[in-house]
């Protein structure tokens, strides 16, 4: 079974874009697809966005996200991912690892 990692922009978005990650996770789940994401726990349950910038330490968040990414077989890129340095890094890692890539606004690569 293929597990997807959801990647997308977070910084400079309200609530760190968690609502978009939650929506994408729900769509994948409804399609019978297993997924991991920085806005979900390891069981796929939505996490609450950090309340303050002090709660959102991006380096730690990136470390946790990369740990999830390497457990997956494919990556699903949310709209706007090209503007995010972290999502760009996740994308490049996924390509290097030979993961299937899908794009929220385009389909599969």
List PLM regions with ranges.
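Conserved catalytic or regulatory cores that recognize and/or transform ribose-phosphate-containing ligands
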Residues: 1-109
């Amino acid at each position: 079974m293929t597990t997807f990692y959801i990647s997308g922009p977070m910084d400079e978005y309200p609530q760190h874009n968690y609502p978009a990650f939650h929506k994408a996770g729900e769509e994948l789940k409804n399609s019978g697809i297993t997924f991991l994401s920085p806005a979900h726990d390891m069981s796929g349950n939505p996490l609450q966005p950090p309340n303050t910038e002090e709660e959102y330490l991006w380096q730690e968040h990136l470390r946790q996200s990369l740990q999830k990414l390497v457990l997956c077989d494919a990556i699903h890129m949310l709209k706007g991912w090209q503007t995010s340095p972290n999502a760009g890094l996740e994308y490049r890692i996924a390509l290097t690892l030979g993961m299937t890539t899908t794009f929220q606004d385009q389909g599969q690569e």
